[in-house]
Design a protein with these regions (language model features):
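N-terminal Sec-dependent signal peptide, specifically the hydrophobic helical h-region
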Residues: 1-23, 110-116
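Residue-level detector of conserved, well-ordered beta-strand and adjacent loop positions
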Residues: 10, 19, 38, 50, ...
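Short glycine/proline-centered loop/turn elements that form peptide/ligand docking sites
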Residues: 15-24, 39-46, 56-57
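Extracellular beta-strand/loop-rich beta-sandwich domains predominantly from IgSF
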Residues: 23-26, 66, 72-101
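Solvent-exposed, conformationally flexible loop/turn segments
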Residues: 28-30
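Structural signature of extracellular immunoglobulin-like
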Residues: 32-41, 46-54, 94-97, 102-112
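N-terminal V-set
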Residues: 42-77
Length: 116
């Protein structure tokens, strides 16, 4: 059984509230999990998804600008980590065909501006 810890980041910018669920998600190998991220500011058009292995810094999986565009980092395949964004305040990320190496903390963030 894989253990995923989904962190709640109480806003990546001053004044934004982020809710993420499920909070924890023990899953079985081969399954798919869908993580939901909701933020409360329509002006925060940038949303980010991160993966953090124990003892390491968070690594950006992908970022989306509004609902029109999602860009994955080179090491994260869009078919493994598909992201949908039905509106400015919500983003969904799935992790497809779970493997042992997918065990990590996953979290989302939102910003008014691009984060480099």
């Amino acid at each position: 059984m894989l253990r995923l810890l989904l962190l709640l980041v109480p806003g990546s910018g001053l004044g934004v509230l982020i809710s993420q669920f499920p909070r924890t998600a023990p899953q079985r190998r081969g399954e798919t999990i869908k993580i939901t991220c909701v933020q409360n500011k329509t002006s925060y058009t940038y949303m980010y998804w991160y993966k953090q292995l124990q003892g390491e810094r968070p690594r950006l999986i992908a970022q989306s600008v509004d609902v029109s565009s999602t860009t994955h980092e080179k090491e994260y395949n869009a078919s493994k980590f598909p992201i949908t964004r039905p509106n400015t305040k919500i983003s969904f990320m799935s992790i497809v065909d779970l493997r042992t190496q997918d065990s990590a903390n996953y979290f989302c963030a939102a910003s008014e501006h691009i984060v480099l």
